[in-house]
Each structure stands twice: as C-alpha cells, then as structure tokens.
C-alpha cells in the first residue's frame, strides 16, 4: 500500500515506437481530474503535444488540463527535487524512460538515495510493447528484454496490426518472460488511466528475488543523467579501461 505521505511514481517504459508518448499525450489531454506530474525524457523519439502546453519557458511547465510536465535535462534526482518545490500542484508522478533504457537503474533511484526514498514511493513499472515488432526487438536488444522482465503491467499495444493467432502466441511468450505482470491488450495506447496509475504493484522483495543485484551499482560509476554534446569529435577516457561487462554497443552509445 502506498504511503499517504509519499508521492507515488509510475515508471513508463517500452522500446522505441511502442506508444509511450501516445499514452502520455492521452493522459495529458483527458479531463480526468487527476493532478499528475509527467517527467518526460528529453531524448524521447517524439515529444509531447505542444498544443497542450500553457507555458514551456521553464524546465517544469503546466498543461492545459492542470497536469504539470517537466523534461529531464540532466540528473533525475535534481529534477525530482525541483519538482517537489511545486508539491502542492500534483499528487502523482508518471516518469517516461527512453526507448533504449533498462528501467532497472531508473527504479534504483527511488531506493538508493535516502532523501528521494523518503519523499517518493515507486508504485509500479508499466511497459508498452509493440505487438507488430517486439519479436524482432527481443532478438537484438537486451533492453527490451529487461523492460518486460521488470514490468508490473504490460500493455500489449498495436494489436490491430497482428493476426489473432500471432497475438495469442506473443502474449504467451510475454507471460513466460514475466509470470507476475498483468497483461492488457490495446490499440493506439488506449487504456483506462487506472491501468497505469495507483497500481500498488512494485514489490521490492520480489524484484530482489528475481534480480539479486538490483540494489547494487550496475557499473563502477554513478549515473548522473544524459547530456547533449555539440557536433564534433570527442575522446572517451575510462580509468583502468572499460569494465569487461560493458558491451561494445554500450560503449558506442557513450
């Protein structure tokens, strides 16, 4: 059960093109009467609908239906701290990850920092899955596998693009990958807001049973955010060489 003194947080994840931003825009445009703060990653494939924005001059801005939205331009912990200065304007946080992100380190944030842990409660992780492309994505991306493995709720989206028998086989595969997640089928990310919020689904004990190293740093350095670099050439230097567990793909993204 969520603590009445903490702000509940849902992490919204899913591979590129799965429908995360479509769902966010739906939530931000509906008159649902809820006061939701949306944390949108600046490097998402598609931004929020600017027609819904009242004032976007600052990092945190208000939407036309009373929700507020902010963009991660650096350290997530700093953004959460700034958001808490407007605590009287929201009751819930919806946090979108990038399509290429493993949600595990994002979820870690709410347990590894004492101040964050005292103010926020991780309510659940919702993963959107593109029914039309997920089989190919699972074959070439570890991140898409982790997004499904960490999910408390899986939204099997774009079901109108897949034949019924293929859809049944896909849902069976997803349930084999994550035996505890609730699976909902949808088109155009059209789901009830109750499917995403107030889940009371994240279970730290269960996560530690499935991922024993969840509360341990994944790499020997702290993640401080994502930063944009101007075009040009850069040299990356790592003390003692790269960690042997880091893949070439990870180094290329760095």
Where are these regions (language model features)?
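Alpha-helix boundary/capping detector
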Residues: 53, 106-109, 132-133, 151, ...
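Short, ordered loop/turn segments at secondary-structure junctions
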Residues: 41-43, 159, 188
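Short, glycine- and charge-enriched coil/turn segments that flank and shape catalytic ligand pockets
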Residues: 1-2, 165
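Short, surface-exposed, polar/charged, turn-prone segments marking secondary-structure boundaries
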Residues: 65-68, 90-91, 98-99, 120-124, ...
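Short conserved AdoMet
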Residues: 32, 88, 149, 178-179
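C-terminal accessory "lid"/substrate-recognition subdomains
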Residues: 146, 153, 162-254
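Nucleotide-state-sensitive switch-loop elements of NTP-binding domains
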Residues: 2-142
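Non-catalytic interfacial helical region
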Residues: 105-115, 131-144, 148, 154-156, ...
């Amino acid at each position: 059960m969520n603590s009445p003194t903490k702000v509940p947080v849902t992490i919204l994840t899913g591979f590129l093109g799965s429908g995360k931003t479509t769902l966010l825009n739906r939530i931000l445009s509906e008159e649902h009467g809820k006061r939701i703060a949306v944390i949108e990653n600046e490097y998402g494939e598609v931004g929020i609908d600017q027609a819904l924005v009242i004032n976007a001059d600052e990092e945190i801005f208000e939407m036309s239906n009373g929700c507020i939205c902010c963009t991660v331009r650096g350290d997530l912990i700093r953004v959460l701290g700034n958001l808490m200065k407007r605590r009287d304007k929201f009751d819930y946080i919806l946090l979108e990850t990038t399509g290429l992100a493993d949600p595990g380190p994002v979820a870690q944030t709410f347990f590894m920092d004492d101040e964050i842990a005292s103010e926020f409660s991780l309510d659940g992780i919702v993963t959107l899955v593109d029914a039309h492309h997920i089989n190919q994505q699972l074959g070439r991306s570890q991140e898409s596998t982790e997004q499904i493995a960490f999910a408390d709720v899986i939204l099997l989206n774009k079901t109108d693009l897949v034949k019924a028998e293929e859809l049944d086989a896909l849902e069976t595969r997803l349930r084999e990958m994550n035996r505890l997640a609730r699976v909902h089928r949808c088109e155009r990310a059209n789901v009830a807001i109750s499917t995403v919020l107030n889940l009371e689904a994240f279970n730290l004990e269960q996560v530690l049973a499935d991922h024993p190293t969840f509360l341990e740093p994944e790499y020997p350095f702290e993640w401080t955010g994502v930063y944009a670099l101007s075009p040009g050439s850069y040299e990356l230097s790592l003390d003692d060489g790269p960690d042997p567990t880091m893949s070439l793909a990870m180094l290329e993204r760095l």
